[in-house]
Amino acid sequence: MGKTPEDFERHTMRSLIFVLALSVFTCSGFPVYDYELPVTEEALNASIARINSQTWGPNLYGVVRSHVRHVDMWNSNDYRLELQLSIRETECTKASGRDPFTCGFKVGPFVPTAVCKSVVEVSSEQIVNVIVRCHQSTFSSESMSSEEMTYMLMTDPRKRGSSRSEAFSSRGRGHSNGDWRKPDYTSPGKVE
């Protein structure tokens, strides 16, 4: 008793319908949060600014990839964004004053890279707190993945006694020589 071409076609059709139905059901929900929040880009800028202000090396880090992992809504004006960033050292020095988004990435086997989780608290569309944790990896010829754990816990610069607060307004890696504004993410009436 052999299978006929009709049996094969029927089985294939059932399989395709099953896969199609499965894909429809997995994608059928309405999104809970709008991840295109106006402050999302500012949260990314504040995160990389905080990373660059806390790293010891002479060069800036730039964002290779980023995405919003989670949004916690506390009420209609207050929420927390959780971002995941892949970063890599750029060719620009910190002293250059350049926007890291305009700097080219360093290339080679010894270039520091990291994966970071950034938690950004927002109140009334203003960033009030940034906490970043990074897992840094450095590749070498002796070990293709020797890793060290680096945690950078960073909060509002005013709370840490520093007036440094940065964000990068321009985009387009390698297209600009640099000057960028540094908006203050804390509310003007808040003094601690």
UniProtKB/Swiss-Prot annotation:
Post-translational modification: Multiply phosphorylated at serine residues.
A GO biological process held by the record: bone remodeling
Stretches for region Disordered: 155-192
Keywords for this protein: Disulfide bond, Phosphoprotein, Secreted, Signal
Signal peptide range: 1-29
SUPFAM superfamilies: Cystatin/monellin
One Pfam family matching this protein: Spp-24
Gene Ontology, cellular component aspect: extracellular region
Subcellular location: Secreted
Disulfide bonding pattern of the chain: C92-C103, C116-C134
General function of this protein: Could coordinate an aspect of bone turnover.
Alphabetical list of PANTHER family matching this protein: SECRETED PHOSPHOPROTEIN 24
Family: Belongs to the SPP2 family.
Protein name: Secreted phosphoprotein 24
Originating species: Gallus gallus (Chicken)
Gene name of this polypeptide: SPP2
